[in-house]
């Protein structure tokens, strides 16, 4: 449970102050200002404990949002609420700034009254909130009985994330599979650690109350304790994509996802995150980095780095950037690269190599001679890892959308009447190779 919520500007002045529990006093406001906002050293942790009081905080631009409690609460739940609160405020009045918060403080207090009940998060869906809290934060006094019953059913009913009566001239559905691949590889090419964090984001512009079914490739198996799913797939001889953990939007019917291996749901209107997942097995590594560092005496280094793309030749990777670290006593660098542009950045102690596009099953290399200043420091250079950024048009986990179906019996439009788009985007997370 959350004891209170404070919103500060960059100076530490309180813009919004709402307390839900008697054990949170006004001194908590000053404690956060002094120990976090005005701290001599930057506070890196998002959770700060001061005098048996926990402060969970996020920062948007120059605005601080702090949830405070003296209870032992689920930190993930508190941060989920804080980020949802930011999204709701942005949906109502745009950019979260001091001016916008001051101009809409009445609206923010109304939103807090609806979102939190005695410190417990209740309803944070923007679509549901907008039905009974207007843009100006003034509740309409001219609602018919039918409109009032619609609001009541949406807030208290089973489908609180979608209002009735939505109509579009053209029914469209956009599905994005967004993945971030993280890697740590040894100089010899051995994978030390690798995992993929993924999200399925949907934009729904559908009329009525549609039923959607989303199916992933047959080989996918969600590993669960007490269920022999991995054994079953190995017996059948099929390779499996094992998802280590997975969370769904509240609109998903979990009972059907377990039994049918498909995700059934009535989607919210507009953009939302359908699911989030993580996998550590059978990852397709888009790039292999092969480093070679040779010390020529005490004042010279020779570096050669080869990158190989490991995907279909018909696909193109974009926004490729390789960062090759250099010693602190570097005096000059001469670079030769086969493709793209490379530049030594003294302020970052790194050679930055950029390539706009690169097709699959190709390789490219860069060579550099690094001149070093003489130093009395006997400690050897630690050789930080080479890092890489990129974007590829496929999912490194191997996840694929098998089907996406829409049914709306009341308005009598079928799956064939819906325009559907599916897109895969794989990006680098922390993608490093030791050298």
UniProtKB/Swiss-Prot annotation:
Keyword field contains Nucleotide-binding: no
Question: What's one GO MF term for it?
Answer: lipid binding
Q: Which superkingdom, per the lineage?
A: Eukaryota
- Any idea which residues bear Phosphothreonine here? 156
This protein's record includes keyword Membrane:
yes
Q: Which Gene3D superfamilies match?
A: 3.30.450.60, Mu homology domain, subdomain B (2.60.40.1170)
User: Its GO biological process terms?
Assistant: endocytosis; intracellular protein transport
- Which GO CC terms are listed, alphabetically? clathrin adaptor complex; clathrin-coated pit; plasma membrane
Q: What is this protein called?
A: AP-2 complex subunit mu
- Give the originating organism: Pongo abelii (Sumatran orangutan)
Provide the organism lineage as a comma list: Eukaryota, Metazoa, Chordata, Craniata, Vertebrata
């Amino acid at each position: 449970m959350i004891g209170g919520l404070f919103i500060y500007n960059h100076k530490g002045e309180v813009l919004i102050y709402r307390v839900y529990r008697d054990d949170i006093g006004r001194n908590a406001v000053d404690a956060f200002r002094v120990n976090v906002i005005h701290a001599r050293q930057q506070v890196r942790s998002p959770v700060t404990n001061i005098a048996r009081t926990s402060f969970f905080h996020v920062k948007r631009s120059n605005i601080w949002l702090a949830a405070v409690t003296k209870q032992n609460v689920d930190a993930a739940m508190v941060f989920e609420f804080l980020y949802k609160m930011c999204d709701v405020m942005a949906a109502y009045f745009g950019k979260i700034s001091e001016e916008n918060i001051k101009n809409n403080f009445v609206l923010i207090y109304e939103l807090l009254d609806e979102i939190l009940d005695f410190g417990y998060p209740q309803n944070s869906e923007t679509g549901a909130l907008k039905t009974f809290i207007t843009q100006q934060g003034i509740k309409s006094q001219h609602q018919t009985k039918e409109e009032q019953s619609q609001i009541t059913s949406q807030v208290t009913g089973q489908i609180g994330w979608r209002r009735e009566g939505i109509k579009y001239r053209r029914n469209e559905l956009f599905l994005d599979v967004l993945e971030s691949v993280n890697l740590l590889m040894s100089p010899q090419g051995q994978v030390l650690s690798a995992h993929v964090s993924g999200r399925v984001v949907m934009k729904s512009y559908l009329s009525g109350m549609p039923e959607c079914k989303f199916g992933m490739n047959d080989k996918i198996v969600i590993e669960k304790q007490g269920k022999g799913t991995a054994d079953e797939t190995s017996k059948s001889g099929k390779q499996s994509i094992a998802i280590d953990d997975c969370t769904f939007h509240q609109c998903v019917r979990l009972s059907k996802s377990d039994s049918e291996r498909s995700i059934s749901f009535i989607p919210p209107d507009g953009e939302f995150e359908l699911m989030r997942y993580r996998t550590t097995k059978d990852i397709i590594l888009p790039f292999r980095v092969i480093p070679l560092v040779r010390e020529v005496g005490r004042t010279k280094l020779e570096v050669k780095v080869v990158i190989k793309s490991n995907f279909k030749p018909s696909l193109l990777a974009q926004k490729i950037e390789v960062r090759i670290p250099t010693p602190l006593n570097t005096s000059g660098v001469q670079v030769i690269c086969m493709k793209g542009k490379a530049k030594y950045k003294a302020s970052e102690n790194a050679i930055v190599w950029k390539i706009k596009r690169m097709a699959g099953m190709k390789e490219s290399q860069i060579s550099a001679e690094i001149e070093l200043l003489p130093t009395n420091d006997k400690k050897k250079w630690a050789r930080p890892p080479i890092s890489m950024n990129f974007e590829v048009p496929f999912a490194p986990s191997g996840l694929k959308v098998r089907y996406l179906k829409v049914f709306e019996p009341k308005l009598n439009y079928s799956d064939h009447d819906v325009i559907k788009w599916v897109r895969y985007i794989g990006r680098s997370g922390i993608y490093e190779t030791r050298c």
